[in-house]
Amino acid sequence: MKKIIAIVITCLTLSAILIAGLTYKQTVLASQQSDPTVANQSAKPKHHYLLVMGHGAGDPGAHGNGTTEAHFLRAKFLPKLRKYAKEVKNSRVTFYNPKHDIVRDTLVFHKGSYKINKKTTVIMFHLDAGGGAYAHGGHVIIHRPTPIKRDRRLAHVIKKYVGLNPAYHGYSYRTNLRNCNVLRRRGIDYSLVEMGFITNKHDFKKINQHLDQIAKNDIEAITHETIK
């Protein structure tokens, strides 16, 4: 009789342990499903876009219409880009230090583009300058001989608000830009956006009139996300 009682007690104990183990496992699984930090661990990492304002750090860039390229990009355009960059959900958008000139950092100090993670996409903004019949409109300097979808979206923004430069029809592929060459040799994806001519009063008027929309549309074009 004592043996039977002992066997029954052992069976009941094992059953209790088994039930407790299953209950604990179900509790852990339920907490993981409801905990966003656990879910985020398996989520796809956000792609990083680094946005760069051209020139700066003592290099004014192009002059025109009472301002300089470096000042206009940093004082007027950068704040609007920052505003809309905060709205994207599936990408990480950061900005190169506006107190620096990425070209100088790269070519003089061997930093800048040499220190950028190879998985980062770099988008540079500039304003063109010059005279003559073709000195108006913008275009995108691309990192491959043919434009990718992002380049086409960026060119569409230029066409919509400023107009395309008739010499390039939206794009140019150049191998004589030393900073861009560093990015290309390192296998880093990039686009350089020439927004329009700072020396052309019609271009500059359009850019100023639509600056907020240009910034919003550029962020959407870069990240391929829709901002409400």
Task: Give the ranges of each region predicted by the language model.
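Sec-dependent N-terminal signal peptides of Gram-positive bacterial secreted proteins and lipoproteins
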Residues: M1-Q26
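Active-site histidine-acidic residue metal-binding/catalytic motifs
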Residues: Q33-H110, H136
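Structural recognition of the beta-strand scaffold that forms the well-ordered cores
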Residues: Y49-M53, R92-N97, T120-F125, H139-I142, ...
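Solvent-exposed loop/turn segments at secondary-structure junctions
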Residues: G56-D59, K99-V103, L127-G132, P145-I148, ...
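A short, glycine/acidic-enriched catalytic loop
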Residues: D59-T68, A129-Y161
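Long, well-ordered alpha-helical scaffolding segments within enzyme catalytic domains
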Residues: F77-R82, P147-N165, F204-K228
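Mature extracellular/periplasmic domains of secretome proteins
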Residues: D105-K119, C180-R186
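Active-site-adjacent mobile loop/cap segments within catalytic or ligand-binding domains
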Residues: M124-D128, S172-K228
